[in-house]
């Protein structure tokens, strides 16, 4: 605990942007609001290495005698770096006190565009097209004068002596608390749920044909039927239908419950009329103990709920209020001990201890042997039926897509009815796949794909829940781990003699990639670590603090660098990537410049939408930067065709491999798996299938298409290191399922599942180099 004398650092709550710093007398650093406050001049000789990182206490002679190249290719070192650094870093982020209330940083591309349109409509102005957006004058940044003290010139942490210089573009939305696009200003019922059109009854009135609205309760005229008029209500009471009162809205405004995006399984007719209240995910007993009224957690199981009591009106009124987060002091202290006091082994995952990992597979099998054996035997006995069902579901999905493409609603609805009978968000991989694709086809058929996708993006899922789901995915899937090891090892090899390393990260998000690199830099040189500069680039968040998320990432990395005695400087940029100028990056002479991106270029629009595409604009920007090395990791997919049926088939093949991978590694009832599939894969599928034009932001290309694009942009490819490729293959073969593939094609590192390529990484330099 000695490394945190002032307690465990929070995030924005502990930042005082107007506070003067008491600097240690031994340091020669200078403080300037314009140029920033850096760690390179600090004297760290008086700092004791933290106990949480025993590698810092190794004998200096051992470190001095290590060859850098030999240490870099150590198989156990790479695994330890990732497990002890990245997963611990994720757990540390989860432990921040206000993480439950923060918005997620993983996805917001289309929500930003929709919020901009809404702002222009509110101002009575016309929203500019994407091609002319850069030439339009925008309102001044509010971050510099924010009443909470945030500023675009510099963001200071009074715990770690560092500064993050922030550049926040004016292309962000000022939506206050609940900004919605114009088409979301029309209220939707709280029981908004995907429903098969041929099986559903009217959600609100209990009568009417299911073909009247695709979702049971939709937009426009269908919404009017959800709100009883006085004469209709009187007629219902005369008939003695007391159940009608249950469907009346209890407040003056209906709200969107996007969690109802998951349709019910067999009891959809009964559940369709229920109104669920958004609450924190806690045990049912804890809800009653703290007087937090909520229905039983049966939304994912599809079981009929009998939760109705006298306080229902009060609960439904409370559902429109912001939920309060309550954590007992003893529980918080215990979690602090687990994250801060850890031994030389791998740290314990404190927030999701039961998630399955490769190393814990044997222990899990021993403790739950009977249950797991039963599942496997059941799966084996029905293997032939599963294969037949998979083929049938894929055929039905393709036929349904063809019917939707020609607006054959009768055939499409019949196909959807058959798909619904054999699909479920809790089933096997093919059933889950069919469930999300059926949802997307329904959305496209109703013309509400953009609304649903943006509602899912605007949904108030806490960053903590999203990080837990992401952590579960990282623990069982080697794709991103291998890409991070490939990029970090290449950086270490290229920067062996550099005094200053400047990493420009497009899509830094929470910065999961960099703790392992920082740890390696601290041990790489006997004379001390080189200075590390990171420019974190992200899209602006909604609200009055568009750069808050990317700034907090810088503060976490600064604290990590301070513990490892690595001089550090951070520059935060929150704006549309195609509008960034070279001057915003603050390049300096003599530094080794590395441009990095981890699977985020797929969200940039291409030339099929705009002549001057953002995808080419970003590549031109990188070429102007003239980096020493450019390391892109891309999602290799072919579902970017403008023709719907072709795109649908390719997306179906791609996500079939992804869902099959999750099904083989994670339990079907795993809550984190459910959340990850819904929040990541489910949203992506909705965007690919149900959105068009600029609203379709999921636009992956194959690695061969990216190779041609990068060559046109003025780059040439570097060969891969044979020893690194061999080590990565050994790691995957020995530590993960045999169906994970790692291969090399030309100068590309390819990763896939059962022969289908999913991700690719490579090294590039400017052609003139």
Curated annotation (Swiss-Prot):
Residue ranges of every copy of the GRAS domain listed in the record: 384-765
Family matches, as Pfam families: GRAS
UniProt entry tagged with the keyword Heme: no
Cited InterPro entries: TF_GRAS
Entry GO MF terms: DNA-binding transcription factor activity; transcription cis-regulatory region binding
Expressed in which tissues: Expressed in roots, shoots, flowers and siliques.
Entry annotated with the keyword Nucleus: yes
Record-annotated membrane-spanning stretches: none
Protein name: Scarecrow-like protein 14
Highest classification ranks of the organism: Eukaryota, Viridiplantae, Streptophyta, Embryophyta, Tracheophyta
Gene name, Swiss-Prot/TrEMBL: SCL14
């Amino acid at each position: 605990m000695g490394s945190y004398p002032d307690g465990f650092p929070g995030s924005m709550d502990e930042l005082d942007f107007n506070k003067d710093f008491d600097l240690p007398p031994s340091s020669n650093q200078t403080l300037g609001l314009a140029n920033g406050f850096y760690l390179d001049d600090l004297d760290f000789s008086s700092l004791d290495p933290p106990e949480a990182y025993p590698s810092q206490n190794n004998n200096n002679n051992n470190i001095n005698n290590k060859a850098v190249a030999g240490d870099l290719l150590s198989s156990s070192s790479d695994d330890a770096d990732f497990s002890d650094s990245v997963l611990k870093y994720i757990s540390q982020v989860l432990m921040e006190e206000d993480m439950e209330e923060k918005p997620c940083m993983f996805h917001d591309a289309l929500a930003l565009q929709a919020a901009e349109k809404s702002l222009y409509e509110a101002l009575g102005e016309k929203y500019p097209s994407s091609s002319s957006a850069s030439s339009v004058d925008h309102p001044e940044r509010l971050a510099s004068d924010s009443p909470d003290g945030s500023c675009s010139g510099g963001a200071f942490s009074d715990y770690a002596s560092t500064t993050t210089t922030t550049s926040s573009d004016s292309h962000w939305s000022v939506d206050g608390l609940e900004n919605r696009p114009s088409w979301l200003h029309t209220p939707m019922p709280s029981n908004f749920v995907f429903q098969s059109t041929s099986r559903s009854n009217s959600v609100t009135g209990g009568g009417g044909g299911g073909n009247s609205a695709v979702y049971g309760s939709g937009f426009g005229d269908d919404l009017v039927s959800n709100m009883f008029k006085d004469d209709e209500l009187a007629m219902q009471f005369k008939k003695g239908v007391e159940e009608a009162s249950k469907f009346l809205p209890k407040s003056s405004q209906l709200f969107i419950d996007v969690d109802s995006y998951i349709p019910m399984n067999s009891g959809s007719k009964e559940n369709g009329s229920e109104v669920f209240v958004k609450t924190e995910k806690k045990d049912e007993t804890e809800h009653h103990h703290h007087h937090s009224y909520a229905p039983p957690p049966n939304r994912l199981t599809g079981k009929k709920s009998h939760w109705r009591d006298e306080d229902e009106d009060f609960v439904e009124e409370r559902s429109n209020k912001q939920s309060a987060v309550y954590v007992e002091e003893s529980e918080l202290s215990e979690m602090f001990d687990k994250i801060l006091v850890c031994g030389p082994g791998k740290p314990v995952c404190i927030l999701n201890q039961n998630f399955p990992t490769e190393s814990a597979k044997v222990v899990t099998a021993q403790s739950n042997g009977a249950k797991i054996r039963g599942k496997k035997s059941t799966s084996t006995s029905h293997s032939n039926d599963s294969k037949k069902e998979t083929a049938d579901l894929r055929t039905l999905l393709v036929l349904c897509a063809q019917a939707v493409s020609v607006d054959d609603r009768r055939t499409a609805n019949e196909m959807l009815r058959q798909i619904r009978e054999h699909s479920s968000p809790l089933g096997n991989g093919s059933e889950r796949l069919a469930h999300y694709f059926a949802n997307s086809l329904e959305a496209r058929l109703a013309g509400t794909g953009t609304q649903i996708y943006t509602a899912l993006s605007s949904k108030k899922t806490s960053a903590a829940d999203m990080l837990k789901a992401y952590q579960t995915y990282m623990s069982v899937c080697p794709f991103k781990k291998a890409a991070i090891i490939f990029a970090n090892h290449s950086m270490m090899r290229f920067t062996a003699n550099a005094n200053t390393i400047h990493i420009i990260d497009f899509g830094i998000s929470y910065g999961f990639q960099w703790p392992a690199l920082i740890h390696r830099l601290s041990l790489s040189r006997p004379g001390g670590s080189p200075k590390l500069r990171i420019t974190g680039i992200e899209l602006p968040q909604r609200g009055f603090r568009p750069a808050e998320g990317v700034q907090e990432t810088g503060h976490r990395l600064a604290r990590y660098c301070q513990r490892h005695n690595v001089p550090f400087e951070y520059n935060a940029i929150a704006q549309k990537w195609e509008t960034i100028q070279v001057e915003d990056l603050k390049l300096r002479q003599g530094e080794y410049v590395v441009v990095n991106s981890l699977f985020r270029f797929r969200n940039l629009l291409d030339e099929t939408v705009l002549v001057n595409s953002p995808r080419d604009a970003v590549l031109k920007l990188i070429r102007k930067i003239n980096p020493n090395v450019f390391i892109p990791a891309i999602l290799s997919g072919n579902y970017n065709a403008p023709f719907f049926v072709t795109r649908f088939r390719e997306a179906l093949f791609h996500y079939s491999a992804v869902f099959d991978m999750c099904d083989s590694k994670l339990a079907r009832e795993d809550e984190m798996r459910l959340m990850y599939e819904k929040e990541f894969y489910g949203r992506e599928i909705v965007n690919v299938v149900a959105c068009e034009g600029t609203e379709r932001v999921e636009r992956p290309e194959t690695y061969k298409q990216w190779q041609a694009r990068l060559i046109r942009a003025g780059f040439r490819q570097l060969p891969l290191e044979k020893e690194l490729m061999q080590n990565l293959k050994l790691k995957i073969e020995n530590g993960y399922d045999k169906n994970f593939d790692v291969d090399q094609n030309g100068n590309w590192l390819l990763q896939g599942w059962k022969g289908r390529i999913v991700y690719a990484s490579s090294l590039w330099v400017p052609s003139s180099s």
